[in-house]
Amino acid sequence: MALYRLIYVSQSASGLEYPDLVDILEKSERNNKKVGITGMLSFGDSMFLQVLEGSRRVVSQTYNRILIDKRHVNAELIDFSEIDYRDFGVWSMKVVQLGNQAEVRSIILKYSSSETFSPISMTGRQSLNFLRELTELYQKGVILNT
């Protein structure tokens, strides 16, 4: 079966709070596990950056459901590619809320023009590398949330 990766960015709707992120995580984990989707959702500075991995059909269907979610606006597709393997296969979904840790801000600055998280300005490759490095920080225990 061919695997695909989809990366998109969106802006949080006004009034989004931490319990909303927990709800997104719980529902995503449950739904994604059933259909073989893996991925990661990062959130900071009112912006979402998410990667989904799985079959083309299931990734497309999942993205279409995400687009109608009222908790975010201005969704924009950054990348949709066939891949050889999953980079985020450990998680049916992981939500990482970006904080002000120096390591996190350093990675943001590495792939952006400022320390403000603005994934809309990232290319597909930059987004993927950002999420990979964020995953490493999480696995090292630097990021301890959601």
Predicted regions and their residues:
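Charge-rich, low-complexity N-terminal segments
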Residues: 1-146
